[in-house]
């Protein structure tokens, strides 16, 4: 039977998300059915300068070849683009040995840092159920991913007065 679910949410630190999930039979008898899910999110963070955009998609088609055998074909895609990405943490002490006491939102990441990640996955599989409860599965998968990062990891202990030394 046809089913659909949609949601929109907003939260702290400009966190906005929307999702749509639709499942439907493609034939009257329901032997062929499909599902599609899409998600988008745009959010900031308690961490200074950090923000992230995310898009994801999932599609699946299932076909009942026999009452005991199902063929599945699907594809999923995910694109995540964070900015203001940290690579490491913040120093806990100044060069004179005193505690920095920075706020928990303190980040050493400049706004030009990023760590983009995209992944795609396509698959086809078959499952057969036997009368004794056993199942036989076979799946072929093709995965691709790409990552592109521009990061900075300052090290050292900054001078309390000038901030230099990292």
Over which residues does each language-model region extend?
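Outer-membrane beta-barrel translocator/receptor signature
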Residues: 1-59, 65-69, 120
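Acidic/polar loop-and-plug regions of large Gram-negative outer-membrane beta-barrel proteins
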Residues: 41-45, 58-64, 68-129, 133-135, ...
